[in-house]
Structure formats: structure tokens, C-alpha cells
């Protein structure tokens, strides 16, 4: 690019940043994302790296959507545990009335200090969220889920009455008020959303999310989470392989992907990720079914390697440190799409 065009582009980018905020336009290969952003870990090392800033950014709206039982709530519970571990206060607005306290505790959530609300209507849920945000004392709020935010008029109406666009209007109005307060209070607000099918779509994906288009626009980060395979131990299914795609990201380049294992009753397996990412970055050697680190065998099969790292946390910490260093030098390492077949845990 010649000097005159380069100056013109720089001036345009500067004006865009001034008018729409820093990060409105970014170079896809730029791994030096916006600095000084406070984040909370997702519980997945690979996803934290794929997000470009090390986790879910504070002071932003995040949407996590996917099919049923794909790991949406698990991801948010890990984020809550991360927030509480850092000394923060978290709230869970359970519009679905389906939170499992026992499972949350297993994932590291401090139940005694977790604020929880089970609202009756969508208006009540979003008003509670707004009041918590405006208090400035809550660091993370999870709303589970957008589909369950039923407008008051629909609840009070007759079964079969038409309520076209009510929920979309509710979300649009609420987000207009929420976003400014979220930015001022530096609160991370996560909306969990479900997938619906559009009727009569001939070309392109028929999938859409509930609640209209407002959340798509206001969200700084949108994560598409999918179950891609079962993890088996002998003949028993003990968990799922999961893929998350960053479909929108206003704090770092988007379209990156991460894959990790979710074990039933345990949540995201960070140790399995260390094995997978270690192999990906040539930090852990794999020969046949055996995994080795610095010439020493750590297990035959991924599950045995995972158990070895569980017993040797200092080794796991060393591998994680090397993975982070390697990922910093490969900004597009998580941009690849890799088909992952069903695998066995042993």
C-alpha cells in the first residue's frame, strides 16, 4: 500500500475508533488485542486463548448459545467460579428455574455467596439485572436463559393468544438501558440463549436465536457451543467433546475455535486440554497411545495422562505456562477448523 493510501486508512481507522469505540475494526491476524481488559476465565484454557484476551471481558455483554445439553450453563458456572476466586461477587438469574446447586458446587462455585433470583416474568428478571448492575457491587451476572424471559402480558394472557414480537421488544428496551450501566460499573453480563429453526429457509442456516436481534447487536462476544462427540470409558459415556466458536468478538479478532472435554459431574477438564494443546504445540509428545513430556512417559491413553497430571500439579502448571507462551506467538492457532470424531477416554 502506498504512503498516501496508508495515511488515509490510518485516519479512517482513527475516526472509527473515536466514533464507535476502540476495537470496532481490527486486523484479523493482529494478536495484540485491546490491552488492559479485565477478564474472567471460562474454565477452558483453549477458549480463553481463542477469545484473545484471556477470558470473558468485564464491562461487556456476552451471549452464549447452542443446542440443549451442549454445555452453556457449565461454561457460565466456571466463569462464576473464576469471578468468586478473584474475590468478586456473582449473581445467577435463573429464569428457567433449573439451576443444580450440587453441580455448581462441584465446579467450584461458592454457593453461600452466590446471589440467585428466580423471577416470575421477563420484565422482573431484566429489572433485577439492571438494579444489580447499577449497584456497582456485582462483578458478574448470568441470565439463564433469554428464551425463558416471558413477557408479563404473555403470562397473564390466555393460552393461544398471539404475542408476536413482545419478547424482542422487551430485550431491545432492556439492553438499551443495560449497556450504558454495564460499561460504567464494569460488570460482565452473560446471556444464555437457545436455538430455534426458521421455517421456509431454502439457503443458508435455518438456525436462529430467541429474543430478536437486539442481543446480537449489543453483545461484544457471542459464543456458539456444540457437542461434537461422546467420551466413552469402556461402554459407558462419561462426558462430551465440545467445540466453541467465537462468532463475534469486539475485543479481539473473531472466528477462532476451541475444543475441550466436559465430563459429567466434573465440568470442563482442564487437564485433558493440557494434553491436547500440549500435543498441538509440540510440547507433549505422542507416540501411538503413549504421551510423554520431556522424555518421560506420563500415560498410555489420554485418560491416564490426565490422571498423571492430576497427581503432579507442578508438571501441569509447567505445561500450561509453555502452552500460553507458544499460543502468544501463534495468533491464528485457534482459527483452524478440525473435524473431531468420537473418541474413547481410555
Curated annotation (Swiss-Prot):
<dbReference type="InterPro" id="IPR027417">
    <property type="entry name" value="P-loop_NTPase"/>
</dbReference>
<protein>
    <recommendedName>
        <fullName>Protein RecA</fullName>
    </recommendedName>
</protein>
<dbReference type="GO" id="GO:0003697">
    <property type="term" value="F:single-stranded DNA binding"/>
</dbReference>
<keyword id="KW-0234">DNA repair</keyword>
<comment type="similarity">
    <text>Belongs to the RecA family.</text>
</comment>
<keyword id="KW-0067">ATP-binding</keyword>
<keyword id="KW-0742">SOS response</keyword>
<dbReference type="InterPro" id="IPR020588">
    <property type="entry name" value="RecA_ATP-bd"/>
</dbReference>
<keyword id="KW-0238">DNA-binding</keyword>
<dbReference type="GO" id="GO:0016887">
    <property type="term" value="F:ATP hydrolysis activity"/>
</dbReference>
<dbReference type="InterPro" id="IPR013765">
    <property type="entry name" value="DNA_recomb/repair_RecA"/>
</dbReference>
<comment type="function">
    <text>Can catalyze the hydrolysis of ATP in the presence of single-stranded DNA, the ATP-dependent uptake of single-stranded DNA by duplex DNA, and the ATP-dependent hybridization of homologous single-stranded DNAs. It interacts with LexA causing its activation and leading to its autocatalytic cleavage.</text>
</comment>
<dbReference type="Pfam" id="PF00154">
    <property type="entry name" value="RecA"/>
</dbReference>
<dbReference type="InterPro" id="IPR020584">
    <property type="entry name" value="DNA_recomb/repair_RecA_CS"/>
</dbReference>
<dbReference type="Pfam" id="PF21096">
    <property type="entry name" value="RecA_C"/>
</dbReference>
<dbReference type="GO" id="GO:0006281">
    <property type="term" value="P:DNA repair"/>
</dbReference>
<dbReference type="InterPro" id="IPR023400">
    <property type="entry name" value="RecA_C_sf"/>
</dbReference>
<dbReference type="GO" id="GO:0005829">
    <property type="term" value="C:cytosol"/>
</dbReference>
<dbReference type="InterPro" id="IPR003593">
    <property type="entry name" value="AAA+_ATPase"/>
</dbReference>
<dbReference type="GO" id="GO:0009432">
    <property type="term" value="P:SOS response"/>
</dbReference>
<keyword id="KW-0233">DNA recombination</keyword>
<keyword id="KW-0227">DNA damage</keyword>
<keyword id="KW-0963">Cytoplasm</keyword>
<dbReference type="GO" id="GO:0140664">
    <property type="term" value="F:ATP-dependent DNA damage sensor activity"/>
</dbReference>
<dbReference type="GO" id="GO:0006310">
    <property type="term" value="P:DNA recombination"/>
</dbReference>
<feature type="binding site">
    <location>
        <begin position="66"/>
        <end position="73"/>
    </location>
    <ligand>
        <name>ATP</name>
    </ligand>
</feature>
<dbReference type="InterPro" id="IPR049428">
    <property type="entry name" value="RecA-like_N"/>
</dbReference>
<dbReference type="InterPro" id="IPR049261">
    <property type="entry name" value="RecA-like_C"/>
</dbReference>
<keyword id="KW-0547">Nucleotide-binding</keyword>
<dbReference type="GO" id="GO:0003684">
    <property type="term" value="F:damaged DNA binding"/>
</dbReference>
<dbReference type="GO" id="GO:0005524">
    <property type="term" value="F:ATP binding"/>
</dbReference>
<dbReference type="InterPro" id="IPR020587">
    <property type="entry name" value="RecA_monomer-monomer_interface"/>
</dbReference>
